[in-house]
A protein has these predicted regions:
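Short, non-transmembrane alpha-helical segments in secretory-pathway proteins
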Residues: 10-52
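A short, surface-exposed interaction/processing loop segment used at functional sites
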Residues: 78-96
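Serine/proline-rich low-complexity intrinsically disordered segments, especially terminal tails, linkers
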Residues: 7-10, 85
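Detector for Asparagine
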Residues: 27, 34, 67-69, 92
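Boundary of Sec targeting at the N-terminus
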Residues: 2-6
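Exposed beta-strand-loop-beta-strand "reactive/processing" segments of non-cytosolic proteins
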Residues: 40-84
Length: 96
């Protein structure tokens, strides 16, 4: 018999909650920051908002972070896009 702890590895076939989307987005921000793809001041910033938004390919979680430490106003809001199944789909400063 296989005993499971309720945690899956790899791709999940269950939809995640908004709370779980925030956790995954925060983890992705740490990785982006460590890889120097975004400013290190993003690390540790709590999500400002999470919402489900429908795009051309279907619904996704959008997790929004705001960082007043960034000098360029167009880059003070960072959007992370996460599939309903928990995969990181992308990140940008426009929300589109």
């Amino acid at each position: 018999a296989v005993a499971g702890s309720g945690h899956s590895h790899g791709h999940s076939h269950e939809k995640i909650s908004g709370e779980e989307a925030v956790k995954r987005a925060s983890n992705a921000i740490s990785k982006l920051s460590n890889a120097k793809k975004i400013d290190t001041s993003w690390t540790g910033i709590a999500a400002d908002e999470v919402k489900k938004k429908t795009f051309s390919k279907g619904p996704e979680w959008v997790v929004i972070f705001k960082n007043a430490n960034i000098k360029d106003p167009s880059k003070q809001t960072l959007y992370l896009f996460i599939s309903l199944y928990g995969d990181i789909l992308g990140a940008n400063y426009t929300g589109e």
